[in-house]
Regions:
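Phosphate/nucleotide-binding beta-alpha loop and adjacent structural elements of enzyme active sites
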Residues: 2-342
Length: 342
């Protein structure tokens, strides 16, 4: 009798594993990522989150591509292994409108933290600020994964920081950590200068093309990431890795991120932080396209380890019947650019 009971339990267990994609992913296109699932660095943490002790068994179970899409819309996400669990708490899709489904899916995707992919994560910088509504929180801090295989190495690290707005807490924190910091902001009324021994400021914009103007301001240059990297090679050396790339450029991220991907510059970036900005009430289809850009980063191999909403971007989302956020701070590390000697 005991053996029969154990057999039944195991049968149910394996049956549940086989239906995980259909049960949890009711509104997505789901396929494995371009790199092998069996070699994914995220697999052990994902298996642990699911209560599965054998990560190889999990890989074998979901190694085949699964496509399931009851929503006939233009918003079809092509998600990889790490993102297959983001919609597990979203239900009643059949009773929602297409716009509702899109908004809920996008919000869940951006809220997904995947924090288990980094054992030691720490925030650098940030100031305590309060809103007109009396909400008090930290703002300006950036998450950095300090796991030895991807952590910036003190006194041997390089940081590119785009978007300062006179708030230097992150840049100063990375300076204290021991990194060479290159700070950029075209909107500040400050010319190029050396802020201290390890930090240099440039009145320059990050763009998808090289121009000698920024928003019709002649004389303030706009440059691609690859052009900026080439400009700085005499200072930080050739073929070096950017240990941390911070991008906080008020919606211009949607212009520069595709160009960075296309240029191959992510091969030179170890960790990336982007503050994303969307407008759900204005154009949901555009938000969907923006979410696809984030997925392209992750399909390339950027491993998300932190995501938090900017509480000052909170809005009422009638489609979701709850508060939502239009700005998110997301951080990734690049598993392709790990410390090989760690």
């Amino acid at each position: 009798m005991k053996k029969i009971f154990i057999f039944l339990i195991l049968t149910v267990f394996f049956a549940c594993l086989k239906i995980i994609p259909l049960d949890w992913l009711q509104c997505c296109y789901v396929t494995t990522s371009k790199y092998s699932i069996t070699k994914s660095r995220r697999l052990p943490s994902i298996a642990d989150n699911m209560g599965i002790s054998d990560a190889d068994f999990l890989a074998e179970t979901i190694s085949k591509s699964v496509r399931f899409n009851p929503i006939q819309s233009k918003c079809k996400f092509h998600l990889n292994l790490g993102q297959t669990f983001i919609t597990q708490n979203v239900t009643n899709f059949k009773n929602m409108s297409r716009k509702t489904q899109m908004v809920s899916h996008i919000v869940d995707y951006f809220l997904w933290t995947n924090q288990s992919s980094c054992q030691i994560s720490h925030y650098f910088g940030g100031l305590l600020v309060s809103s007109a509504a009396g909400i008090v929180s930290m703002d300006g801090q950036k998450a950095i994964c300090l796991d030895p295989i991807v952590a910036p190495r003190p006194y041997r690290c390089i940081v590119y920081s785009f978007g300062i707005n006179y708030e230097w807490s992150f840049d100063d924190a990375m300076d204290l950590y021991g990194c060479k910091v290159f700070s950029f902001d075209p909107s500040m009324n400050v010319s190029n200068h050396r802020r201290n021994e390890k930090t240099i400021f440039y009145q320059m914009a990050l763009n998808d093309v090289d121009k000698n103007e920024w928003k019709n301001n002649i004389g303030i240059p706009s440059r691609t990431l690859s052009s900026i990297y080439n400009m700085l090679e005499p200072i930080h050396g050739q073929n070096v890795i950017i240990d941390y790339l911070k991008i906080d450029i008020e919606s211009a991220e949607w212009i520069v991120l595709p160009q960075i991907l296309k240029s191959g510059m992510l091969d030179k970036v170890r960790q990336l932080s982007v503050e994303t900005h969307m407008d759900f009430n204005e154009d949901v289809e555009m938000c969907c396209e923006q979410a696809k850009i984030i997925h392209l980063l992750e399909d390339y191999g950027m491993i998300r380890f932190d995501s938090k909403p900017n509480i000052y971007s909170a809005i009422n989302l009638p489609q979701r019947k709850s508060l939502g956020f239009e700005a998110y701070e997301i951080a990734w590390y690049n598993y392709r650019v790990s410390h090989v000697d760690s």
